[in-house]
Amino acid sequence: MTSLIRSNSWGSFVQTITSSSNRLYIGWFGLLVFPLLSLATVAYITAFFLAPAVDIDGIREPVAGSLIYGNNIISGAVIPSSNAIGVHFYPLWESLGLDEWLYNGGTYQFVVFHFFLGVCGWMGREWEFSYRLGMRPWIFVAFSAPIAAAAAVFIIYPIGQGSFSDGMPLGIQGTFNFMLVFQAEHKILMHPFHILGVAGVFGGSLFSAMHGSLVSSSLLAETAGSESLNNGYVFGQEDETYSISAAHAYFGRLIFQYASFNNSRSLHFFLAAWPVIGIWFTSLGVATMAFNLNGFNFNQSILDESGHYINSWADILNRADLGIEVMHERNAHNFPLDLA
């Protein structure tokens, strides 16, 4: 009798977890996703408001990132783990107590690891839900692009640089600081993979805007002229709601014939693939720069017939990068050895 009750309870639990008719699909991955993301969110908000200063450079000069220490929404951040910790895994039980753990930035690792595992689980949950519904797996493939970006920035880059103190601070101003320092140290703007990522993101935005405007402009009229086109649409209807041939003809004449798609599947695959591939490349670029395989440096690359270099915009950019680099962690650097 007891085993029967346990069997029924387990079956009911499995049915609840894996049912695709729930208002919110849970899934087996969801058992990991929701606790992990909840812990990361609570820890982040708490640290953003209340965390003490963190000795990010490992030189006993702590940096405050929480609101209680006078920061605002723009300047506030969860400060990365101390350079004294390096790339060591630093849970609470590895410290002498909570005060030391907070001082060394243990909160940063806590938030980053729980968040990253949570979004990886979310990607698995997307695959699982698609599988339950008999759908193809392209949704989770597309979501792999931001997962790859998160892995590159939060995991691979700090490991490649030898310390989680080089990770991106979890705040608005901290993000921009990370970007400027990344450019100064790695010449990311001159890296081909970053250029492909920019083309992917901005190109994807352009293509999405073009597609949305074309669809909205070629809706099939099912109503009288005095009525809204929306009144002729029934949610979930099998009939097409817009004329792809009309949109194709318009765009083909606006640009040239072969610039448009006359196949809906090809069109939407292109809209999905373009930004995803671009972000994949950017993530790969950040992962390579983590190990100092940097972007191009054209400093002093133009020479006259006597062998003297001629200043160019590349030299101006290089000088700006050097200025940013010596301003960064200025108390930890030994000027001018950092410029060598």
Curated annotation (Swiss-Prot):
Topological category with respect to the lipid bilayer: Multi-pass membrane protein
GO cellular component, one term: photosystem II
Residues at which [CaMn4O5] cluster binds: 166, 185, 328-329, 338, 340
Residues where a quinone binds: 211, 260-261
Gene3D superfamilies, per database record: Photosystem II protein D1-like (1.20.85.10)
Binding site for chlorophyll a PD1: 194
Quaternary structure note: PSII is composed of 1 copy each of membrane proteins PsbA, PsbB, PsbC, PsbD, PsbE, PsbF, PsbH, PsbI, PsbJ, PsbK, PsbL, PsbM, PsbT, PsbX, PsbY, PsbZ, Psb30/Ycf12, at least 3 peripheral proteins of the oxygen-evolving complex and a large number of cofactors. It forms dimeric complexes.
Other facts noted in the record for this chain: 2 of the reaction center chlorophylls (ChlD1 and ChlD2) are entirely coordinated by water.
PANTHER family in the record: PHOTOSYSTEM II D2 PROTEIN, PHOTOSYSTEM II PROTEIN D1
Name of the protein described by the UniProt record: Photosystem II protein D1
Native source species: Amphidinium operculatum (Dinoflagellate)
Phylogenetic classification of the source organism: Eukaryota, Sar, Alveolata, Dinophyceae, Amphidiniales
